[in-house]
């Protein structure tokens, strides 16, 4: 059964196509030939008695500071090794208006690059309700705004050829995160494939006293 996102207000459900790699997945994972075009569909449901506007945003996949793949829009800059940005090959409506208590299928148009390649183009389609204004004050009087969105991952490939993993260390620097001193290590995956279950072993030694060491 295909998974989908749902709140009391609205529902987002991908319509899985015939060229889906695994039809049990709750996101798009399609195989399409070079230069080919396809229209994917997502069903939106308005569960309220009020007209509703849903914003759509396309984004390329990225890896966050915790090593997790994210498919929603982010301020993380695209790596220079990114050859195909999903946003350049997928189009969708920017805003969809839903009448009260209705369902509507929307089209997501996909065009595969003309060049042949092995591996995957990865990204996502994010849906968010316009006019969210759920503001609350915490115990310290700080106002917190809660907004909700759903992201459907979209993976596109031309074939099932395996891609050998690769990993490059491009930069090391010091900095701060949440007031803590940290060592920033930039790892680059230049291939069009996921690197899963990766472990990092690091040793930090003092410059003037090599006996001072931290192991991670």
Put a short name on every predicted segment:
Residues 4-216:
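Long beta-sheet-rich domains in secretory-pathway and surface-associated proteins
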